[in-house]
Every structure is written in C-alpha cells, then in structure tokens.
Amino acid sequence: MELSLERKPMTVNETILDINTEQAVESDMLLADYYPRISRILRCCVETSVDQAVVSGERLIVDGVALCRVFYKSEEGRPASVTVKLPYTKAVELRRAPQKPQIAVQSYPGYFSCRAVNSGRLEIRGAVVLHCRVTAPSEAQALHWAEGSGMQCRCRPLCCGQLLRCSTRSLTARGEERLSDGIPSDAALLRATSRVGDATFKAVGGKLVAKADAVTELVLIGPDGTLYREELEIPVSEILDAEGADENAICSVSFTVDWTDAKLSSVAADEQPMASVELSLTAWIWAMANETDSFMTDCFSTCYETTQETRPFQLLRGVEPVHRNIPIEAEIPLPEGSGEVMDLWAELAEQSAAGGEGSLRLTGRVRFAGLVQTGGEPEYFEHLADFSEEIPVDGTVGEQLADFRVELQRSEERRVGKECRSRWSPYH
C-alpha cells in the first residue's frame, strides 16, 4: 500500500506590528469671554483616546483626540479650568498587508507643556504616545495521520485555540441632566471625571452584546469659591463584532473611559443649568475558541528506513479572563502652610502588563492629585505611587489584552503638627 498522509490545518496568529510611536499635537487658544482671566497656570491634565484605527494596504492609520484640561488661578484668586480638544492622525507602515487583521491601539499622554501667553491666551504643546499592535491569523498544515508503507504513528491530542477577536474599539456615550437646586445657577465647571462599571455581555451570532453603567462626577465652583459635586449616570451599550464567537467561546468585554467632556448650558436666572456630558470610551474585546484534535508527534516505517523533520508550532489556548483589584495606599505630605483640601482625585500615570511562564505581571503608577488652599490661594499638588501584582496562570501568557481602571475609594485627612497628610485608597 502506498504511503498516504493526512494533514489538518492549524491556526497560527502572526504578529504584523508591535511598536510604540508618538504623534505631536499643539494648540494656540484664545479664551472665550465667559472664562475668568488667567493669573497663573496650576496644572495641565491630559487624557487621550483612539477614535479609529484601520489598516489600509500596508499602512495602519490611527485617528484620535487628546483632551487637555488646564487648571489655573483666575485674576480673582479662585481656581478655574478650561478644556481643549486636540485631534491627531498617525500613519504607521506595516511590513505587509494583512488579511483579516486584529487591531489594538492604546494611547497615552506623552510630554505636554502649557503656558499662558497672556491672561486670555494659552499655548499647548505635547505628544501622544501610541502602542500599536496588529496581528493576523494564518494557517499551517500539520500531519494528522499516515498509513501505508509500514508506517507506525504516535499521535497525541493537542488544544488548538483559535483567536476570534483580540482588539479594541472606540465608542461615545452621552448624557444630559439638570443640576440640583442646591447648586448656584451661575456656578462654573471645574472638573469632570467618569468611571464605568463591569460589563455584562452575551454572545449572539458572532456578535457580543455588551452593557455597562458609567457614572460622571462633576465638580463645580460657585461665585464665592464654594465647591459643589453632582453625579450623572450614563448607560453604555454596544454590539461588538466577534466573528465565530458563540456560547461555548471564551469571551471578555470591558469598557474604560478615555476622557470626559462636560458643558453647562446657559439658562434664565430662575432656572437651573443643564449639564451635557460626552464620554469617549474604549471597548476591550477578546474572544477565543478552544478545540482539541489529534496530531502526529512521532513515526517510523517497518518497511523502509525513515528520517524525521520537525517544525515547532506555537499553539494558542484560551483561559478564563483574570479580574483583580489591587488596593493602593499613599500618605502624602501637602504643601507647607496648606489649609483646606478643596478637591482630590486619582488617575493612572503608567500601566503595563507582561506575560511569562506561569504568570501575568501587572505594574504601573497611580497619580494622586488635588487642589488645596495655601495662603488664601489655590495650589495644585500631586504624588505618584507604584503598584505591582503577579498573578499565577496556567501555561505561558501570549496574546493578551489588559485594561486598567482606577477609582478613588476613600480618603482621610490627618494633621501631624504643622504637616497635613492624606491617605487615599484606589484600586484598578
């Protein structure tokens, strides 16, 4: 009997691009008449988003926005802020044009500088850092069985995971609500931050139907310098592509907030203003199907002398998503002579996830920031705290998506002699 070989396809995920790159942004802005005039810049906070990332031929084209929120002391001696949107576009060359590419692009603020040219004009310069990753599935043929010519085969079952989706997608959510009666109608917006809860989702016909709830906190300042807080709930729902995903696939969907843009509408003196909120969010989508099949690992012939040639394959195997809360505490000395802590918040400064043999390592830094009264004037302060967590996993971590969120859970202020310290506990 003649030798007959039976082959089966194996799905291999090929990395086309995995780099960090930068895109410069800048703005020369005139303050509108209704903004208080600038006395001194306190802080420029930057949040970034990726609105679209597409592959066109041998190029990856990324469009996004850097949202800059500039805190400053007004000429009246009170804190104020103004928000500027800086759009950007970046094109990155690929080594080849992929078929059915999976695209995941993360954006971070790089260096940024902000200066007041005069009391009504701002100059902003900086760069957005982009981590671009493009992968594409490809097929490789592997021997499943051989017969004839006295062939004897040894086979073993192998898990061959097929990566259905490993990418990010940008989306926008909006909400509107009238402010509470206790807030002055002439209050100005100082800061807006948002957080989004865990997503619930269901796989239906190659789609992932996902829902979550976002909460936006508005910090407003009255004409006498008093701060007010208001919360606004915004539902988030999206239908996400995950071709091939069904109820048996291992899936994960989560949402993170890239930036929050809020505006107050002008109203009559006897009416409360409306708050309009726009959220830029990133949906993190991961879907994988595990299949087990039998493949040849050794063979010999009882009729002929045989030689073997082997080729290594990296087989994927999907595991359940890992969710981990990491408490972080920081005790922060405030500026000398500090009085009342007016406002405080927490934000991610750095984040990274690295896989290895039997573990997943999460590292980064959290920035604790706030405004405090010093000598009757507002001052900005901040403190960086590192975090690190190693999570044991079964096998070697390869393709992965890691999204980070941070939320200020608790704070307490303690006076130690002439020094004020705060202890804050966020998680991610």
Where in this protein do the model-derived segments appear?
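Positively charged, low-complexity/disordered segments
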Residues: G417-H428
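C-terminal beta-sandwich interaction modules and adjacent acidic
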Residues: M1-K418
